[in-house]
From Swiss-Prot:
Family: Belongs to the class-II aminoacyl-tRNA synthetase family.
Full protein name: Histidine--tRNA ligase
Pfam families: HGTP_anticodon (PF03129), tRNA-synt_His (PF13393)
This protein's encoding gene: hisS
Catalysed transformations (reactions): tRNA(His) + L-histidine + ATP = L-histidyl-tRNA(His) + AMP + diphosphate + H(+)
Keyword Transmembrane helix part of the UniProt annotation: no
Enzyme Commission numbers on file: 6.1.1.21
Keyword NAD (UniProt): no
Subunit structure: Homodimer.
Molecular functions per Gene Ontology: ATP binding; catalytic activity, acting on a protein; histidine-tRNA ligase activity; transferase activity
Length: 423
């Protein structure tokens, strides 16, 4: 039987994985500059965590989670997103007691959602996200948004659009919720079944419906911005002022929502406007939450974060025709001719590697011509040719592949010679 990977997953092969490594390195470097620290949580958690932390009325919980019972009969779920596990760890490890608030965390790892595979969407995907937990300052909202924008800009993406909104506070959402119910209830039968359920459970999520987004009721729905109280309006104005101060352009879209009750104030998405990117234009989404920490068992603690898919980021780079500066090839390929030279080549390659030189050699006992072809295929910068005669004289021939220039070097100084030539 020939096995194939499960639908909605992918193998990331050599030659492609270097792009992932490059993007992840840039993300880690940015996090370090912003003083965010990596956190690693399990890829599966108790299902109840996501029922509470993601919301039992969301599509993720109702339709997309990979849930199973372990051998003790406990319900477990492969993590569909990163915020709930990070907040669970924040509470469980009592990070709220750390005097250096906010706690700034980031994560990179696989997430799992059972959804229809399509361009930019997989059932296993890699998510990069950050969480800043413990501050109510609108400046941290601007900082988090700036981090996401810096990642995309540093990779060369230009066709980006930042969309922001405010969900206000508890008072705002309560008033807006009633206005939405009044607006939709007389014609709710015109909308999809999901929206009909959402009307009573979570009417704000009707605005996020993909099926009915073009329905006239959506265009005329009450704007949450009209229900902001003075405090919420002031908070939103501060966030916008900080973004302007940082030189980050944005659009305000009152239909940009987060359906969970603990999301308050700032919410944002970063879109790609690149031609050929596909129907799914959202690259990154985030927002401020007040209540999630309490929901998961901790004290009242605010937070803000974002998450993005590495797969979708790479697709955006491709759509804009951006080639990442991936270094290909090796520094030195050791060609050995003769039994003694072959034995010595193992030690030589080991010395080169210990000195930080990327090196390889032949392991197929091939002729010199075939070994040189291997060096060429591996894009070796230099080839070190060692034969039994050279070994007897304690010398080695170094060939620079780009010029064909060949130099005889004392065997004891080959490491220093190559380090100097490669610097």
């Amino acid at each position: 039987m020939a096995f194939q990977i499960p639908r909605g997953t992918q193998d990331i092969l050599p030659g492609e994985v270097e792009k992932w490594q490059y993007v992840e390195k840039i993300a880690r470097d940015i996090c370090k500059r912003y003083n965010y620290h990596e956190i690693r949580t399990p890829i599966f958690e108790h299902t109840e965590l996501f029922l509470r932390g993601v919301g039992d009325t969301t599509d993720i919980v109702q339709k997309e989670m990979y849930t199973f019972e372990d051998r003790a009969g406990r319900s477990m779920t492969l993590r569909p997103e990163g915020t709930a596990p990070v907040v669970r760890s924040f509470v469980e490890n009592k990070m709220y007691g750390n005097p250096n608030q906010p706690i700034k965390l980031y994560y990179i790892g696989p997430m799992f959602r059972y959804e229809r595979p399509q361009a930019g969407r997989f059932r296993q995907f890699v998510q990069f996200g950050v969480e800043a937990i413990g501050s109510n300052d609108p400046a941290i909202d601007a900082e988090v948004i700036a981090m996401a924008m810096e990642l995309y800009r540093s990779l060369g993406l230009k066709k980006l659009r930042l969309v922001i909104n405010s969900l206000g506070d508890v008072e705002t959402r309560k008033a807006h919720r009633q206005a939405l119910i009044d607006h939709f209830k007389s014609r709710i039968h015109e909308l999809c079944e999901d929206c009909q359920v959402r009307l009573e459970k979570n009417p704000l999520r009707i605005l996020d419906c993909k099926k009915d987004r073009d329905h006239e009721l959506m265009a005329t729905a009450p704007s949450i911005l009209d229900y902001l109280n003075d405090e919420s309006r002031h908070y939103f104005e501060k966030v916008k002022a900080y973004l302007t101060k940082l030189g980050i352009p944005f659009e305000v879209d009152p239909r940009l929502v987060r359906g969970l009750d603990y999301y308050h104030h700032t919410t944002f998405e970063i879109m790609s406007d690149a031609e050929g990117f596909g129907a799914i234009t959202t690259l990154c989404g985030g927002g401020r939450y007040s209540g999630l920490v309490q929901e998961i068992g901790g004290p009242e603690t605010p937070g803000i974060g974002f998450a993005l898919s590495i797969e979708r980021l790479l697709a955006a780079l491709e759509a804009e025709g951006i080639t990442l500066p991936i270094s290909e090839g090796i520094d030195c390929y050791v060609v050995a001719v003769g039994e003694k030279a072959k034995d010595e080549s193992i030690l030589l390659v080991h010395k080169l590697r210990k000195a930080g030189i990327v090196a390889d050699k032949d392991y197929q006992d091939r002729k010199i011509k075939a070994q040189l072809k291997s060096a060429d295929r591996l894009n070796a910068k230099f080839v070190a040719i060692l034969g039994d005669d050279e070994l007897a004289k304690e010398v080695i021939n170094i060939k620079e592949m780009s010029t064909g220039e060949q130099t005889e070097v004392p065997l004891h100084s080959v490491v220093d010679y190559l380090k100097e030539r490669l610097s």
